[in-house]
């Protein structure tokens, strides 16, 4: 899950629990993948060489870091205060693994459609969503948090024809309860595995990459996407917003 090494409600302790990539703690975790029997992704507070703190996640394999993602969208509303604690990441990029190209999003990132769009256009066949999702419902509708998150990830996997892994924490921290219910969705948006609510659990699931192929044949949205049109329209919108005209 998000910030899986530290917990979420860090406040003034954020700098105390931060670790550089070359720290013994991080290197020990990376070393567990050296034999090639497993790949590992985990969330932590990263301290950069410039001493900027990031809400970050590392994917490691065969004893090496394959990708570092720094959370881009930092919620600073309601119970969240990340904009005060962390620097903002600057990219959404897929990365190669022995299973194919993957992409990581951290919690609030998932709620921005452009994030998963960029990962899919960059070749990702699986979305890894690292989350600290509290029980509190979404908006005035009272939509349950679990239903909202599962619906969101299912939608993104379906429209992009890729797998989705939703990894959410459990437990209570500073009055906030996190519901767990981690789940895996196939490229058709169907839930194929789900963990229990409020209970730590290991899910072991085989993912058939043939389903990615089938999904993209049956609904070729990725093939038909017009990136150039999207870029042109975004440039036009930016000009209008900055007062430069259409």
Which residues does each PLM region occupy?
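Short beta-strand scaffold segments in enzyme catalytic cores
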Residues: 42-44, 55-59, 93, 182-184, ...
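Short, conserved active-site loops that position catalytic residues or coordinate cofactors/metal ions
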Residues: 1-17, 129-132
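Active-site beta-strand termini and strand-to-loop segments that position acidic
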Residues: 95-98, 186-187, 207
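Hydrophobic residues at beta-strand termini and immediately following loops
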Residues: 69, 95, 167, 195, ...
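A short C-terminal boundary segment appended to hydrolase-like catalytic domains
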Residues: 210-246
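CN hydrolase (nitrilase-like) catalytic-core segments centered on the catalytic cysteine
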Residues: 21-41, 107-202
């Amino acid at each position: 899950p998000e910030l899986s090494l530290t917990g979420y409600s860090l406040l003034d302790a954020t700098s105390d629990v931060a670790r550089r990539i070359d720290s013994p703690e991080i290197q020990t975790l990376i070393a567990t993948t050296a034999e090639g029997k497993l790949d590992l992704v985990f969330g932590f507070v990263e301290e950069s060489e410039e001493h900027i703190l990031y809400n970050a996640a590392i994917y490691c394999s065969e004893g090496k870091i394959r990708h570092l993602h720094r959370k881009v969208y930092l919620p600073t509303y309601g119970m969240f205060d990340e904009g005060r604690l962390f620097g903002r990441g600057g990219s959404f990029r897929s990365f190669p693994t022995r299973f194919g190209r993957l992409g990581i999003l951290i919690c609030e990132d998932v709620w921005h459609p452009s994030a998963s769009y960029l990962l899919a256009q960059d070749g990702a066949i699986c979305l890894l969503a690292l989350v600290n999702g509290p029980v509190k419902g979404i908006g005035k509708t009272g939509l349950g948090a679990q239903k909202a998150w599962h619906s969101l990830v299912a939608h993104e996997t379906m429209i992009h024809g890729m797998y989705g892994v939703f990894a959410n924490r459990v437990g209570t921290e500073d009055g906030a309860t996190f519901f767990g219910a981690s789940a895996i969705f196939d490229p058709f948006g169907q839930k194929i595995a789900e963990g229990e609510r409020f209970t730590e659990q290991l899910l072991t699931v085989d993912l058939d990459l043939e389903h990615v192929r089938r999904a993209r044949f049956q609904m070729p949205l990725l093939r038909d996407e017009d990136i150039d049109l999207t870029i042109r329209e975004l440039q036009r919108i930016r000009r209008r917003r900055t007062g430069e005209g259409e």
